[in-house]
Amino acid sequence: MKIRAERLEDLKEICAVNIAAFEQENEAILVDRLRGIDNTLSFVAEESEQIVGHIFFSPVTLDGKCPEELMILGLAPLAVLPQYQRRGIGTLLIKLSLEKCTDLGCKAVVVLGSPAYYSRFGFISAKEKGLKCEYQVLDDVFMVLELQNGALDGCHGTVKYRLEFQECA
């Protein structure tokens, strides 16, 4: 299994992975609309020269207070082809891509997802760090991971995703 940054020639396969994983086109459309925006990151899992997984990060904003300006990214989507799920591919994508986020100066990552799954990587309820989601979601499914200890100390407010998220919902 190889994890690497996406390449131009991967775009059709990435689209297919997202459609297969989510059984709809919304996530694939979202990725296409966000691709190329500053501070987006996209990685693929490749096995035998086939893309079997994909993870994408895009910038979010904090409408509130923070002692300093921070780069915060939103993890969405994470997709693995159904026949490759439950083999650790999503785990590998998350672990390696979070390292890349840190290398690029990102201080925290937010995600909307399963607490049972994402807590394995250190994600906690964003509410514990004074953050809430702009969408009406349960507190426990909106999570955050500080990539630098204490990065969110003194921060509070509403995390806002890019407009493309609403357009593709």
Which role does the model predict for each range below?
Residues 60-75, 85, 104:
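A conserved beta-turn-beta hairpin within the catalytic core of GNAT-like acetyltransferases
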Residues 30-35, 129-133:
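Short, solvent-exposed loop/turn elements at beta->coil junctions and helix N-caps
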Residues 1-30, 37-52, 70-72, 149-150, ...:
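Short amphipathic alpha-helix that is part of the acyltransferase structural core
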Residues 40, 138-143:
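Short hydrophobic/aromatic beta-strand or adjacent loop that forms the aromatic wall/cage
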Residues 75, 80, 86-99, 110-111:
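Conserved acetyl-CoA-binding loop-helix of GNAT-fold acetyltransferases
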Residues 103-107, 112-138:
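Conserved active-site alpha-helix within GNAT-family acetyltransferase domains
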Residues 50, 81-92, 104, 120-121:
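Conserved glycine-rich acetyl-CoA-binding loop
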